[in-house]
Amino acid sequence: MIKRQKDRKFELVSKFKPAGDQQQAINKLTAGFEKGYKEQILEGATGTGKTFTMANIIAKLNKPTLVITHNKTLVGQLYGEFKGFFPNNAVEYFVSYYDYYQPEAYVPQSDTYIEKDSAINDEIDQLRHATTSALMERNDVIVVASVSCIYGLGDPKEYARSVLMIHEGQEYERNTLLRDLVNLQYDRNDIDFQRGRFRVRGDVVEIFPAGNSNHAYRVEFFGDEIDRIVEIDSLTGEVIGERESISLFPATHFMTNDEQLRRALKAISKEMKVQVKKFEGEGKLLEAERIKQRTTYDMEMMGEVGYTNGIENYSRHMEGRKVGEPPYTLLDFFPDDFLILIDESHATMPEIRAMYNGDRNRKKTLIDYGFRLPSALDNRPLKLAEFEKHVNQILYVSATPGDYELERTDHKVEQIIRPTGLLDPKIEVRPIEGQIDDLVGEINKRIDRNERVFVTTLTKKMAEDLTDYLKDLGIKVRYLHSDIKTLERMQILRDLRLGKFDVLIGINLLREGIDVPEVSLVAILDADKEGFLRAYRPLVQTMGRAARNANGEVIMYADTITDSMKAAIEATQRRRKLQEEFNKEHGIVPKTIIKPVHDVISITKPSEDSKKEKTDSFADLNFDELTAKQKKTMIKNLQEQMKEAAKKLDFEEAANLRDAIMELQSSSRRPKTRKGKALNGKR
């Protein structure tokens, strides 16, 4: 079995030193964990450099670390930042490897069975394998993950037992190596050399590990002895360097042996008979026949080829778990003494809590109607209580920690001072009567100063009406809403920053990627209408959009001051006062953040001859006017751009490209119903 190296240290590389009150936060939180505190909170205002603080804590504690956040875009951003902070350590990326996923489901009302359909992203699968192999080999590992890390991943002990370690001079027959590779789920293919495959050329075996992106190994034999091991470029075959020894990890996380498979098939057969008998006793003959046919077919497939579509539904039997026992997840691959950082904890923890119930409700219907055995319920994400049992030490990080975190621990550290000296925005409450005329006056002031404005409304109709009204007044305005596609959204934000329009109206401007330094005014209409979008945390998050500009201001239009408004205003004013005192003491003058405006991702690929080729923006396209060939070409170009972005570690751009590809693929499958450009949500 492979042994983990334990003597590696985290090495933080940065031209910056902790500034503002980052150092006190780093010291307090590090000391707390060293004292044995299990749970702590970092309440850091927007723009105070919470990620840099997290990096310093990781370096000081020197423990394997799992960073979890609630969506893939944020995972990509954090991965890129940590990769930059720790270039000499293992920083890994772990998200769901599905580009497209339609879960198996049944709708009783219409008697509709929806079969599971999915498309796996090969690059993300490689990154997942790189994650688990790094966790097995070394202790200086940071894994940045989405909540998919609480889903089943296979038994880490069986995975570790399966690792094949070979070294130069070892007595090892070539054919024995080939059999061992097949047992590790590697495929032999002498022509198409890809991850998880090997090829044979006389006494030379070339192996492309599942966790590598472009490097493979060449193992050269002399008789029954390994004569030489070299690392090669998988595409060109160029030798990169010689290796004394290598560890070959399985090509799948779900490793099983023949004995386990025999036991599993026996247990599945037994459960099937019990379920058939139950249905027959209830007079449900259709369900009884259905579960018998489906399960028998699956067992025959597993017996013949070791696999069947939906094999994960039998994971409890394959792994020998008891009824209700939690599945193995990424968390089980970590050593006992590890650190968890929950980024944006106010959003991430509710998502971790919600995963189990959503999964269970869908599967319960499949079981009740004879599509799956009851054991399918144990192929699931962790329950919140099970997640908590995995926690050794955990840090919740948020500008607005949730009730869950605040109830779990009293150990809270604030980070209020921004290294840039920027203050929390000024806040003013004005009456609703005449709010639009007042807003127009404030917008014109910002336009005169070449600044931008965010306006947040409560309803889609109000946002649309306000957009039309401002346009009639000659104000350059756009409306951001949920119907707008990924790349069009990026184009809108870029155009706002470039000054192509001055006002952006939306219902929920809390989504990631909305930080625009040019925005000096955030106007919140109907601020006193209590609800999700006007609760304390969303209000604080919305106010934070004006915290990137030295002239940042928030105007809340309301006739009464609700408890949520009062709490949000008081919290912001308290922080602003502390920031002003700090700036005065240290002679700091706040300056607006200077952030370069990146080009929106192009749809057409520039030619080698001319880099000036015109490109279309995603916003200007009507998918229904494109031919199937045009869509295919566009998808291919976007896929190339996605791979290039991933190579440059720009995972935010890669994730946006992936979303755009999925939108194009989806438009290719659905019937044509749209007319005209999908701009501003109009049909």
From Swiss-Prot:
GO terms for biological process: nucleotide-excision repair; SOS response. Residues 435-601 form the Helicase C-terminal domain. One of its GO terms (molecular function) is excinuclease ABC activity. Residues 669-683 have a biased composition (Basic residues). GO terms for cellular component: cytoplasm; excinuclease repair complex. A motif (Beta-hairpin) lies at residues 97-120. The keyword Transport does not apply. Its main location: cytoplasm. CDD domains: DEXHc_UvrB, SF2_C_UvrB. Residues 31-414 form the Helicase ATP-binding domain. ATP binds at G44, A45, T46, G47, T48, G49, K50, T51. Residues 632-667 form the UVR domain. It is found in: Cytoplasm. Residues 662-683 are annotated as: Disordered. Pfam families: Helicase_C (PF00271), ResIII (PF04851), UVR (PF02151), UvrB (PF12344), UvrB_inter (PF17757). Keywords: ATP-binding, Cytoplasm, DNA damage, DNA excision, DNA repair, Excision nuclease, Nucleotide-binding, SOS response. Forms a heterotetramer with UvrA during the search for lesions. Interacts with UvrC in an incision complex. Belongs to the UvrB family. The beta-hairpin motif is involved in DNA binding. The UvrABC repair system catalyzes the recognition and processing of DNA lesions. A damage recognition complex composed of 2 UvrA and 2 UvrB subunits scans DNA for abnormalities. Upon binding of the UvrA(2)B(2) complex to a putative damaged site, the DNA wraps around one UvrB monomer. DNA wrap is dependent on ATP binding by UvrB and probably causes local melting of the DNA helix, facilitating insertion of UvrB beta-hairpin between the DNA strands. Then UvrB probes one DNA strand for the presence of a lesion. This is UvrABC system protein B. It comes from Lactobacillus acidophilus (strain ATCC 700396 / NCK56 / N2 / NCFM).
